[in-house]
Amino acid sequence: DSLKKLRTDHFDLYQLHGLTTMDDLEKAAGPDGALETFVKAREAGKIRHVGFSAHSAEVALAAMDRFDFDSILFPFNFVCWHEAQFGPQVLAKAKEKNVARLALKAMAYSPWPENASHEPYGKCWYQPTSQSQLASKALRFTLSLDITAAIPPGEEALFDMALDIAENFQPLSPEELEGVKKLAQGVKPIFRLSA
């Protein structure tokens, strides 16, 4: 029914969304799980590539060990990378397994302070890097990684800012990379490795 509504005969990429816990992975990849259905759809020509998204490094690594996914959608973010060492191991495993690396949350900064207004970014459950210089450095950090693509934020103003930054993209210099690392110091990341 979805293929008919979209007037196509296949999906280029179909992803398991939001693998957060090992239980999520077990259910999706186990007998009669969603992954089994995705594989059958791929064999039938309805799906070309199978991917997944995760917000847990441990689950992402386990998923790539368990199945030969074509892509991963994962939060590659300068604060998480430097303050929580969250992301380098996932990027390395994805490169090793030749999995396309799609980044999200590149312009995320930290959790919202308690009782803080989320205005004007009501769609963001995290505090974004809304100041233009910081946003530019944050997105350029992610785009400077060995990724396939970065998904812009869904918040309209941030989306437009991301497009402007990407249009004039220059990889971060070694000095700028060091500066971004300093900008992350002491900032609470939105994701951490499991204890």
Model-derived regions, located:
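Active-site groove signature of glycoside hydrolases
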Residues: 3-26
